[in-house]
Amino acid sequence: MSEAAHLVQYIVVPYRAAAEGVAPGEIRPASSEFGAIRIANSMASKFAGVAAYEVLVDKETGDMQSPRILAQIGTVPALDD
């Protein structure tokens, strides 16, 4: 698939405490890298952990790939390789 078939997006994922560690909450979109980091910082006190990511989104399927961590606050699970 070509790069043109992908779109860069910024997302923030809050994580709540769960019996097995942490569980992801609702993904929040951001308009920029700076915005994602700002949102993550503002949410940090309300969750066990928060992470801001830059991801490539397949325009056809909506699948997210190649996450890059922009900010990680509190307890956040490791990205799968």
Question: Which role does the model predict for each range below?
Answer:
Residues 1-2, 14, 37-41, 56-59:
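Intrinsically disordered, low-complexity boundary segments flanking structured domains
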Residues 19, 37, 77-80:
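A broad, structure-centric signal for solvent-exposed, well-ordered loop/edge residues
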Residues 2-24:
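Short aromatic-glycine-(Arg/Gly/Cys) micro-motifs in beta-strand/loop hairpins
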Residues 21-33:
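A short, exposed loop/beta-hairpin motif centered on an aromatic-Gly-Thr core
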Residues 30-49:
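A short, charged, amphipathic alpha-helix used as a generic interaction element across diverse proteins
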Residues 9-13, 27-29, 49-54:
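Ordered hydrophobic segments in well-structured contexts
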Residues 45-81:
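Short, mixed-charge low-complexity intrinsically disordered segments
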